[in-house]
Regions:
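FIC/Doc superfamily catalytic core
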Residues: 1-209
């Protein structure tokens, strides 16, 4: 619930924590006086299914097929999925940007993703910083038309599980530190690393509780 609520909120979902919990527990939204976007409901439900998928596949090697499958689960049934130019479960067809930064062009995404995965999967011992660095590179490629942040954070969670590292949730309240860390990675890796370590401490508190 925490992972889904926070990851979707970072991307603009307006659902409350209670509404998110209600979808998880009953697969319905419940009564609400506030207007709720249908996509917020769909993407909350599909994000829960993505979490099921990363838990079931935690020990498997990261691959293009798996990453595309996560995107397919996340975006199926959304308004985006009905657009001709939006590729559900496949790489982007149109250029996009994140935070004013240009990302990899559509025609170069496949090659860039293959290289990123080959470099990452060749590591004998994966540490937390390797997972964070993969995330930074993934977000800079921005391989999908939309949903990159959520898929990227799901990948981090999965890879932490795979390598025996305490996973973490980037909560909505620390998103500005998270975004700064992504932007400043080349100059100062400590910003994002410290943000993730702080989030890890919060997750440890959940486990202890």
């Amino acid at each position: 619930i925490e992972l889904t609520y926070n990851s979707n909120h970072i991307e603009g979902s307006r659902l409350t924590h209670d509404q998110t919990r209600y979808i998880f527990e009953t697969n319905t939204i419940g009564l609400t006086e506030e207007g709720v976007r249908v996509d917020d409901i769909i993407e909350t439900a599909t994000h829960f299914r993505c979490i099921d998928e990363i838990i079931e596949s935690a020990k498997s090697q990261l691959s293009e097929k798996f990453i595309k499958h996560l995107h397919f689960i996340l975006k199926t049934g959304t308004s985006d999925s009905k657009k001709d130019w939006f590729a559900v479960g496949d790489y982007k067809k149109l250029p996009n940007e994140v935070g004013g930064r240009e990302t990899t062009l559509p025609e170069d995404v496949s090659a860039e993703m293959k290289k990123l995965l080959a470099d990452y999967n060749s590591k004998e011992n994966v540490a937390l910083e390797d997972i964070i660095e993969f995330h930074v590179m993934f977000e800079r490629i921005h391989p999908f038309q939309d949903g990159n942040g959520r898929v990227g954070r799901l990948i981090m969670f999965k890879e932490c599980l795979k390598h025996g590292i305490v996973p973490f949730i980037i909560e909505d309240k620390i998103k500005m530190f998270y975004y700064r860390g992504l932007k400043e990675w080349n100059q100062e890796k400590g910003y994002l690393t410290d943000t993730c370590l702080s989030a890890q401490d919060t997750f440890k508190a959940y486990l202890d509780y």
